[in-house]
Structures are given as C-alpha cells and as structure tokens.
Regions:
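Short beta-strand elements
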Residues: 562-584
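Glycoside hydrolase catalytic-domain context in secreted enzymes
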Residues: 1-537, 541, 545-555, 559-560, ...
Length: 1006
C-alpha cells in the first residue's frame, strides 16, 4: 500500500535509531494502518466542518469549530486506547508495566564480591620468569598501551552489561598500593577517549594506539626515572554478529566491506562484513594476511620501545579470544604474562592483587593458544562461505521477506571431533605435528606462585565405574589453589570410530592449601561416559554410543599435554548402548541428523596418522560453493513463502476444546506434574487467539493471558548479568564466560548463578537468557566472550552449576544457543552447518546435554539458534528439539527462538510443529501469522502453550501462589490520562457553550 510505504520511509530513520528494524516497523504500520487512516479521515472531516462553519453566524461559528475539535480529540483518544489495548497491547504493556528496578545494596555488594572472586581464580598466569609477584620495594608502575585506559569489561549484544561503575586496570593497580605514571595515562586519554564500537550492523575494528613518535625521549626518560617496571596492556574482542577479521588489510582498504555486495542480494541488511579501520599513522597497522588476533604494527612499535627501555616488563592480555602470543618469547624483557578476559564490574581488582602477590593465581586456560592461527584445522572452513548458484532463490526470498539478509551461507565442520586440544594432542601422538612448534600454551594450563605435587591413588575398577582419589600437596612456600584435571584415552583402531588421544572427563578445584598441607579429591567415573558415538555405522547400524573393547587410560594432567600420573583398565568386549541406552538416557540415542547434516565434504580422520589432513582442512573446492539440487529442494521446504505447514496435518487428529470455562488459574497448576490431568483442563480455556498471542509475543517477555490468569512476565539478557533494555533494568556487570570458565571451579559457578539470580529477583525478572554454552570452535568467533571454552565437558559442567545456582532463586535459565551456533558470520543468512553426527553429539551437543541432565531446578528453558543444522533450521528441528532434547535427555520446559527477525525462514507455524514453543519477537512479522485452524495445527499450538505455561508456573513468578493482580501501571496511567482529558474536554466544552449562550443573550438584549 502506498500509505504504508510512505510511513515506513518517513519513520524509518527515527525508529532505526531506536533499534527497531524496518521489517518490524513495516509490520507495526500494517497493523495500525486502518487506525491511521481513520484518524486522517476524522482530521479531514474536522477541517471540512471548520471551513463550512465559516458560513454560520460569528458566535455559533466558534461553537461548531470547538465542538468539532473536541469531538476529534475525544475520538482519537478512544482510538489510541483501542490500539494500545488491542493490537499493540503486549508491546506497550511490556514497557509501561515495567517496574522501576532498584537493586538492594546487599544484592549489589554480593555480586561485586562474587565477580572479584571469579577474577582472582580466573585470571591465568601464562608466563612468569620470577618477576611476579613484584617485590615490595616496587611502589610505582609505568602502564603502557591505550587499552590500559579503556579495558574490556565484557562483550556486546546479549553479552553486554552496564560497566559505568566498573573498576578499571589503572584503578586496580592503585587499589593494590601502586602509583602509576600519569603522564603516560594522559597521553593515552588525550589520544582517544572512547573505545571503538563493534556492533551488529557496523563494526569499527580500529585498535587505538599512539605511534612511536608519541614516545618522545623526554616521555621515556621520565618513565625510566619514575619506575624500572613496565606493564603493557593489549586488548581484543569481537561482538555479537561480528566475527574477528582474518585479514585486517582488507578491512583497512575497504575490500572487506564490499563483500556484502558480492554475497548478498540485500546488502543493506547484511552487516557481518561492514567493518572499518582507521590507521594510527601514515602507514597500515596490518600487513596483508595478518589477522585481528595478531599484534598490529603500531603495537609492535610500542613493545619495541618499551622493551628497549625496560628490563622488567609485565604483559596483560585483556582479550576474550585466544590471541597469537608467539611474540611474547621474542622479547626477553617480558618476564610475565597475565591473561585477563573481560573482568566485569570488579574483576580487575584481582589484577593488582596478583601483581602484588596478595592473590596467588589459580586460573587455567580454557582454549589452546596456538602460534599460527592460519595453521589450525578449522581455518579454511569458517566465516564467509556463500553459495554462488542460488541467486534466483535469494531474490525470491527477498521479495517475500524484507528482513532477509540476502545471502545463503554454509560451514563444514571438516575437523570433525578434533577441536582445540583434542586435535593437537592427537596430531602430536600421530606424528602429524611437532607439538612445541604449534602450541604456545596448552588447554588447562596456568602457573602459580607455589608448586604442587599430585598423583592418582586408590584406583579401582568397579565394573560400570572406576573410582580413585587425587591428593594434592602444596610443596611450595605460599598458599594456593590448584585444579585437578582428569583425562581419558580410549583405544583407537586405525580406520575405526574417530577418537581423540586426550579427552577431559572430570575436574575439581581445590581449596586454598597452605604450604606443606594437602587436600584429597575423590572421583567416580562412569565408563559409559567414555563411550564414542558411531554415526558412520562402523559397528552400529543406525548409529549409537559404544564403549569399545580394549585398554583405557585415566590420566591426571597439569594441562592437556602434561601427564602427571595415570592408571589403566580394560573393557573385555564392546558395550553397545544403541539398544538399552546409557543409564542417563531417557530414550536410546540413535542417528537423528546424519541424513541431512553430514554433507558431502571430506572429514578429517585419524586414519593413517591424519593422512587426509590437507584435503579435509584445506580451502573448500569450487564445487563446495555450488548448492546441489537435493540440498536446494530440502532448503526450499523451509523458506518463508514456499513452506507449507499442511504437510504435517493428520486427518485423524481431533480438535481440542478451546475457550472453555473450567475456572482454573495458572497458579493452580504450580508445582503439579507435567502430566497432571488439570493441565488439559487449563489448556481447554485458551482460545485460538490466546494461543497465537502467547506463542508469538516472546520478545524479552511472555504475554499476559487473562483466560488462564497468566500475568505478563519479563525475560532478559544475558550471560553477563541483568540487562533488560526494554524495562531499563540493568544489573551489575558480570565477567565474560571465558573468565568464569578459567576458574575451573564448579562451586564458584554455582555462586555466580546465585548472586546473579538475586539481581533478577530484585528486578522481578525471572527469565534469564543465559547461560550461553556454544563452543570456541575457532579463535575468531565474535561471541567467544559469551561462551565458556573449546571443550564441551568443561562448558557443560560450568553451565549446569551456574544454572542450578540461579534456579535456587526461582529464575528459569534459557541455555543457549541450541545448537552449533559457533560463528557469527551468516548466522541469520541461511547458515547451513554441516557435520557428522558424531561431531554434533560429542563436540557440540554435549555441553547442553550435561547441563540438561544436571539441572536441579523446577523450571528451565532453552533458546534455539539462528543457524541451520544441515538443511533444517535449528528453530524448527524436530530431531533436535523433540527427539534429542526432550526424548533422549528428558528436558521438560519451553524452547524459544533467538531473536525472531524472520530472516526468510523463522516461521511460527514451522517452529511450533517441531518443538519450538515461543518466538522471541513481538508478533510483528508476516511469518508469525497462524492461520491454519486444523486439528493438527491447533494441537501444536496447544503443546507449545503448555510448555510455556509450565515453565512460568514453576518459576519465581508463581512461587508464592497467584501473583498480585489488580490494576496495572499501564491501566492506571491510561485511566489517569483519560480522566484528565475527559475533564479538560468537558470543562472546555462547557466554557465554550456558556460563553456562546452569554453572548447570544447579550445580543438579544441589545
């Protein structure tokens, strides 16, 4: 419609600045266009009446005009009420009914204390030549690096937080008793005050750093006189929707940004490559082929300058991604390196404490630091891979959905199960690599100011389990904590089921152990947890878990590479779990994804010492970019405008009751079993419109449904703490999940959940969009700050404990992003993610599996992901959301999409028919419309509503029975405005009429 287009073009600049997409704006206008036209018609009528009234007598003329104006205002007020309590109710009420959030001081204090504890146990000492802790004689420090004045406290997007009250690096050093060189600090703050923004729509990858000319002789002479010790801070981070560039030269020269036009038919919607960079000098900061995770030329110049003037140099790497750090060994003056990811509100206090020795570092790496990222097995199979032969399909989708990003991407998980340390340990054992040439710092690595001796004791094979103890003795001179890391090695047959040479199976963090003292940790390992998944049918037709016969090794290691103690046991014959399942399974695990997710790429295999490494991990061949007819046909079935939900309909399904008057309220179901008969009675009370609203209005909320007494509730981000941009409720800035994971402390993860959960309670917000537990498949993933580790077991246990902590407060966590959402590029552009089922289950579902099976709360939720698993969207994947999540793992609760931007494939009908219950949007897209009123479709809606209602009913919202009802803030506001407006209009109308009558009477008397 011409009017709709005009209004969209007129209002887009204003609403886009508020974060409202053009697609959403278009949808809102389409909903309201009838009302807008009515108001315009009324305006025209009013104007006509006023013009015609000119012919009336002078006094009566004014009465007519005033009456017309008053009538117009009154009718518009009625229409505004109808709009706000009709089509826009959930959008308006979510804002107006939001409560003013004031966190209790006790809550904030607890959060800040917990965050500092996380950093004290999570910062990793990567190198120490004896320089740390600093001598008590050192009172002053020269702090170099622009990042020292603008450190990274967390991430962006859903992983962002309010860092306005956060303690920075310089303040932490001062709090630790050091003075810092203010001349250096002033030079950096004068150079640039603000950090460049890395956002979803546009990224500024600039690394501000003064060129070497700024380090004048007088400045450096002053610095040397000030102190003989230098601290250098280097920072890096990505962002939501923004993977880190692998070729910074292309960002600098602009060719990177031009890729949007090459791969997208809607380049304005395609933001992944809209990056820019401003050089610090009259030269390029990066040379051709250098990545964002390498030092810039200006940073190298700064390090050259510092190391030429100081013999005592401490480097602080303030990064959320594992950088290339081989340059550390090129400077003999660098005596210590501390890895300090985004530290949240108070985490940097730990930095000063580690430097002065009041805290003994005990953090361990959660990723493998490699010397050359271009030599990693994933390097050629990530990022901007787009199909080249589907232009017609892309044009068709763009015509149907204005939110479509215009591209179709793919990613092959060609490295298979060999992610991170699992590749390097196995490749070293097979002789493919020389370990020391490739790995700078292993997974699970971290130094301490003391030394520990530990070994496996009392090892016993109990049949289904093995049990043992590990005694950790502090053999050094200061108290400290240590991490006990347990790995297993399974027997591998050449050409058989893929197996890594080292696999983390258990871990524990000790208490602080005094010198000469010890602590014992006891372990029970289930043998079934060492089973491999046979997706290729090597031993199990149809796929399944199998514990193969042979010798197994349980090893105690100080990191993934260094074995301290080991024990062995033997499995006499293969144990096939594809028939009866593992003890933790609700149903047997068999192949679910292999038919459509495996793809036809060469997968890395350990066979013959990784003989196919070059082919599997090389640049994809040209035909990989050509979508096959079979793949296209499968994709088209899931495309908005082509998708036909009636294919799911079953004529034998019976239409359930709707709109019944059973007298139940949602509060009556709190605490009742999921299968309780009263649930059907409650669901019978829902109308078709109730169900459509409850399903579609899930944007940072769940909708009010009066027919069952369900209140409107708030959900919000995120992994870094309370961050509700709708209600303006912001909590304490929690650190990145990388720093949390580096503690290797499950009890502390639980404490994080408890303290963060209390902030949600204070905000009356019990839905938490977190934690996130995707895998650090690559170092370049823009959202690694939001995920724990490259290892699925570490991720799963940390997540489970954090979730359980939050659940004690009545918070229902949305573990996300389910699943294989391991890169940002093309995430909403039909990102077809191909992997073997073994890879999917062992590498990428396992964290979610452990968190689900280990959850101890009453209410839990899941957020599905943007990407596709093979040719099926994750948000509408029956095998993922029903067969695996609910069937195998026993999950009970609701599943919500990631942000429902439509994107050409997020279709409500498709989602609810395949296990996704709630749309994270505002019922604003054409793809949200639920029009199929068949029994099958209504049953799917009913099931989705049950999952939503069950989750909310068992959360903190309903912990004390029926939540307080009565008049909402929105209703109070509207009643007040309506009453005031009515009184004003009546008074004005009365005055007009009285004055007219008075003048008329005077005229008669005259």
């Amino acid at each position: 419609m011409i009017m709709t287009g005009f209004l969209v073009n007129l209002l887009s600049p204003v609403f886009s600045s508020l974060g409202v997409s053009q697609a959403d704006l278009t949808s809102y206008i389409e909903k309201l266009i009838g009302y807008v036209i009515a108001i315009l018609v009324l305006l025209v009528v009013m104007i006509v009446v006023m013009v015609v009234a000119h012919k009336a007598k002078k006094g009566f003329r004014h009465v007519i005009r005033w009456q017309a104006a008053i009538a117009f205002i009154a009718i518009v007020a009625v229409l505004v009420n109808v709009i706000c309590y009709g089509p826009m109710y959930n959008n308006v009420s979510s804002v107006l009914n939001a409560k003013k959030v004031v966190l209790a001081q006790e809550t904030t204090d607890q959060s800040r204390a917990t965050i500092q504890k996380v950093a004290e146990e999570g910062m990793v000492l990567l190198k120490n030549d004896g320089i740390l802790p600093l001598s008590s004689d050192t009172k002053k420090l020269n702090v170099f690096g622009w990042d020292s004045t603008n450190p990274l406290f967390g991430g962006t997007g859903s992983g962002s937080s309010d860092s306005s009250t956060a303690i920075g690096i310089l303040q932490s050093l001062k709090d630790a008793g050091y003075e810092t060189n203010e001349s250096l600090t002033k030079m950096y703050t004068d150079y640039r005050a603000d950090r460049p923004t890395i956002a979803m729509a546009q990224q500024d990858w600039t690394l501000p750093e003064p060129t070497k000319e700024y380090y004048t002789d007088s400045l450096m002479d002053e610095a040397k006189e000030y102190s003989d010790t230098a601290v250098v801070v280097i920072g890096r981070s990505g962002g939501e929707g923004a993977d880190l560039p692998t070729d910074m030269k292309s960002v600098i020269d602009g060719s990177y940004a031009k890729k949007a036009e090459e791969v997208s038919v809607s380049p304005d919607n395609y933001g992944y490559v809209k990056g820019s960079y401003t050089n610090n000098g009259d030269y390029d900061d990066f040379d051709e082929g250098e990545s964002y995770l390498e030092l810039s030329n200006t940073e190298e110049d700064m390090l050259d300058t510092v190391c030429s003037q100081f013999d005592n140099v401490i480097v602080v790497v303030n990064a959320n991604n594992a950088m290339e750090l081989d340059w550390v060994d090129k400077y003999e003056q660098i005596g210590a390196v501390i890895f300090a990811p985004g530290a949240g509100a108070t985490g940097f206090e730990a930095l000063g404490e580690i430097i002065n020795g009041s805290v003994n570092p005990s953090g361990k790496t959660v990723d493998t630091f490699v010397k050359d990222l271009t030599e990693t097995p994933y390097y050629n199979n990530m990022g901007l891979n787009a199909y080249t032969n589907v232009e017609d399909l892309k044009e068709q989708i763009a015509a149907n959905d204005p939110a479509y990003e215009g591209s179709m991407g793919f990613v092959n998980y060609a490295e298979g199960i060999y992610v991170g340390y699992k590749f390097y340990e196995t490749a070293a054992e097979e002789g493919l690599i020389k370990y020391e040439d490739m790995v700078q710092y292993p997974f699970g690595y971290g130094l301490s100011y003391t030394t520990f001796d530990k070994q496996i004791e009392n090892f016993k094979d109990n049949g289904d389990t093995v049990t043992f103890d590990v005694t950790v003795e502090n053999t050094g001179s200061v108290a400290g904590k240590d991490v006990v890391e347990i790995y297993y090695t399974a027997p591998y047959t050449n050409g058989g089921i893929e197996k890594a040479a080292a696999n983390l199976i258990a871990f524990e963090k000790t208490d602080s152990i005094e010198p000469g003292e010890s602590q014992t940790k006891s372990f029970t390992i289930n043998k079934e947890d060492m089973a491999s998944y046979d997706s290729e049918g090597i031993k199990i037709s149809g796929g399944g878990y199998i514990l193969e016969a042979g010798e197994y090794t349980i090893s105690l290691r100080s990191d993934s590479h260094t074995v301290l103690s080991e024990e062995k046991f033997t499995v006499d014959e293969d144990i096939d779990y594809s028939k009866d399942g593992r003890s933790s399974d609700k149903t047997v695990a068999t192949n679910q994804f292999e038919d459509y997710a495996r793809g036809d790429f060469e997968q890395l295999s350990r066979e013959d010492g990784f003989a196919n490494y070059d082919k599997a991990c090389g640049v994809p061949e040209e035909d990989a970019y050509v979508m096959s007819d079979e793949t296209r046909a499968a994709v088209e079935e899931n495309v908005f405008g082509i998708y036909d939900g009636t294919k799911y309909n079953n004529d034998s399904d019976e239409m359930p009751a709707m709109g019944a008057d059973n007298g139940l309220q949602l509060a009556d179901l709190t605490g009742k079993d999921y299968d309780d008969a009263d649930w059907d009675k409650l669901l019978d009370q829902l109308s078709f419109e109730d169900m459509a609203t409850l399903i579609n209005v899930g944007g940072w909320q769940t909708a009010e449904i009066k027919s069952v007494g369900k209140i409107a509730t708030s959900d919000c981000d995120g992994p870094a703490g309370l961050n509700n941009f709708i209600t303006k409720a912001y909590g304490t800035a929690y650190p990145s999940e990388v720093l949390m994971a580096q503690t290797w402390n499950k009890e502390l993860a639980n404490e994080i959940g408890v303290s963060m959960g209390q902030e949600y309670v204070d905000a009356d917000n019990y839905g938490w969009y977190g934690p996130a537990m995707n895998i650090h498949r690559t170092a370049f993933a823009g959202r690694n700050f939001e995920y724990y580790s490259e290892d699925s077991l570490l991720s799963g246990y940390m997540a489970a404990n954090e979730m359980n902590g939050a659940a004690t407060k009545g918070v229902y966590p949305y573990m996300k992003h389910f699943a294989l959402n391991d890169q940002e590029t093309n995430r909403c552009s039909f990102l077809l993610t191909f992997a073997s089922e073994q890879t999917i289950r062992e590498g990428y579902l396992k964290a979610f599996e452990l968190a689900t099976k280990g959850f101890e709360g009453k209410a839990m939720a899941v957020m599905s992901s943007f990407n596709w698993i093979g040719t099926v969207p994750s948000c509408a994947n029956n095998e993922l959301l029903n067969n695996v999540l609910r069937g195998e793992w026993g999950f009970v609760g609701m599943v919500e999409t990631d942000y429902d931007g439509s994107y050409g494939y997020m279709i409500t009908d498709h989602c609810i028919r395949n296990g996704n219950d709630l749309m994270l949007g505002f019922n604003s897209a054409e793809s949200n419309k639920l029009t199929d009123e068949s029994a099958t479709a209504v049953l799917a809606m009913r099931q989705a509503c049950k999952n939503i209602l069950y989750t909310v009913a068992n959360s903190g919202y309903y912990a004390d029975g029926n939540p307080a009802s009565g008049m909402t803030n929105m209703t109070k506001l509207f009643v007040m405005i309506d009453v005031i407006l009515a009184v004003v209009l009546i008074v004005v109308d009365t005055i007009v009429i009285v004055r007219w009558r008075k003048k008329k009477k005077q005229a008669v008397n005259e």
